[in-house]
Amino acid sequence: MSLIASIYAREVLDSRGNPTVEAEVYSEDGFFGRGIVPSGASTGEHEAVELRDGDKSRYLGKGVTKAVANVNGAIAEALIGKFDVADQRGIDLAMIALDGTPNKGKLGANAILSVSIATARAAAEEAGLPLYQYLGGPNSYVLPTPMMNVINGGVHSDNKVDFQEFMIMPVGAKTVKEAIRMGSETFHNLKKLLEADGKNTSVGDEGGFAPDFANNEEPLQYLVKAIQAAGYKPGKDIALATDVAASELYDADTKKYKLKWSTGEEFTAPEFEKYIEGLVAKYPIVSVEDPLDENEWDDWVEVTKELGKKVQIVGDDFFVTNTDYLKRGIEMGAANAILIKLNQIGTLTETFEAIEMAKEAGYTAIVSHRSGETEDTTIADLVVATNAGQIKTGSMSRTDRIAKYNQLMRIEDELNQGEPEGVSIYKGINSFYNLNADAKKEIQSHQG
C-alpha cells in the first residue's frame, strides 16, 4: 500500500492535433501511472464537461490549460498524501465531490479522468499486474468482438454521407487475433474496390475511408463486396454495424430527420425508423447506434420494440455513459445496449457502475474510443477487465486506433501464455448478450 506522492498534468495533443490533458501519478514507493484523455466530435449534449480555455488566440480556443491547472492545483492538493493509489473509488469520489457539479463543469471531466486513469495504472504497477487484471481480477478473460469503422461519414468526415460510421464486425472469428486479421484483409480489399471505382481513399478521423457516395446504402453495398473479396461470407463471418448519429440529422423545430449531406430527404420519426428497418432487412446489419435523436425517449422505445429483437440498438449520445440516463432507458425499454466512453462520464468508478448496471439489465456494454484519440490504450484493458464482449476502436489505419488492437493481441497472448488455445475466450456473435439465438442465426444466415 502506497500513498499518492505526486500528481502532474500537462497539455498534449490528440489525433486531430487538438490539445488534451495528460496526467502522471507517482506513489510514495515510486510506482508510476499515466493517463491521456480522448475527445469527441459528435458529442451528446448531456456529456460531462470537457473544459476548454476558449482563448481564440491559442489553439483556436481549444487549449486545456485551465483543466491542467485544476489537476496541478486543486486535485493534487486534495489527493497527495491522503489517498492510497489503490483506493480507486475513494480517489474518484473525492474528485467528484471537489468538483461539486452534476456534469464536472468546475474542474472538467478531462482533468478528472486523466487522474483517474493515471492512478489506476500506478496501482496496477504497484500490484505487479497488467491493467486489465488489476481492474477486473482473475476472471478477466473475454476478448472483445471489434466494431471496425472502415467507412466514415457525418461529422467525422468531409464527404456527402449522413450516417457517421459504417462498421464491420468479425463475428465468425475464433480469436481476437483472427478477428483483427479478417478486419484488416477486408479493409484492404475495400480500398481496392474504392480505387477501382475512382473513389477517394483518404481516411477520416477514425481511420476509415471517407469518399462521397450517392446515398447511405451505397457504403453498405461496398462493405458486402469487400467482405466477399476478402474471402469471407457477409453475415456468417463478418456482420455489419452502423452509427447513425441521428441527433446530428434532427431538427427539433420541425421534428424531422434530414439527410442533409446526401439526398436532402426528410423523415418523421416513424418514417426514419422504417428507413433504418429497410436497411436492416436488406443487409447483414447486427448493430445500429443512435438511430434517433438523443432527447426523443418515446421514439427510442418504439424503435427498440420494432428492431430490438432483431439487432442491437445502441445508445451513445442517448445514454452518455451515465447511470441516470441508463436507468431511465432500462425502465422504459429504450435501447438494448450502451456505448461506454470514459470521458462522457469522467471517472473509472462511474464507468464500472454503468457497465454493471447494463449487465444486470441484460444490456450489452460496448467499450468505445472517441474520434479524437491518443496513444493511450486503457480502453483495451478495460473491455477485457469487464468481460464486456465488444469494443469500438476505429479502423485498420492510424496508429491511435491500431494501438488498441495491438494491445488486445498482447493481452490475448498473455492470457494464453503463447499457446494457440488457452484461457481467453472470443465470443464473436455470442458477444451480443442482448439478442436471442434466433436473431443471431438470422444475422449469420443473411448474405447481404
Swiss-Prot record:
Binding positions for (2R)-2-phosphoglycerate per the UniProt entry: Q164, K341, R370, S371, K392
Database matches in InterPro entries: Enolase, Enolase-like_C_sf, Enolase-like_N, Enolase_C, Enolase_CS, Enolase_N
Active site: E206, K341
Presence of the UniProt keyword Cell membrane in the record: no
GO CC field: cell surface; extracellular region; phosphopyruvate hydratase complex
Metabolic or biological pathway: Carbohydrate degradation; glycolysis; pyruvate from D-glyceraldehyde 3-phosphate: step 4/5
Cofactor binding, per record: Binds a second Mg(2+) ion via substrate during catalysis.
Gene Ontology annotations of biological process type: glycolytic process
Enzyme class of the recorded protein, top EC level: lyase
Annotated S-S bridges: none
Keywords assigned: Cytoplasm, Glycolysis, Lyase, Magnesium, Metal-binding, Secreted
Residues the record lists as binding Mg(2+): D243, E289, D316
UniProt-listed CDD domains: enolase
EC numbers: 4.2.1.11
Requisite cofactors: Mg(2+)
Stretch forming the signal peptide: none
Function: Catalyzes the reversible conversion of 2-phosphoglycerate (2-PG) into phosphoenolpyruvate (PEP). It is essential for the degradation of carbohydrates via glycolysis.
Name this polypeptide is given: Enolase
Species for this entry: Oenococcus oeni (strain ATCC BAA-331 / PSU-1)
Lineage, uppermost ranks: Bacteria, Bacillati, Bacillota, Bacilli, Lactobacillales
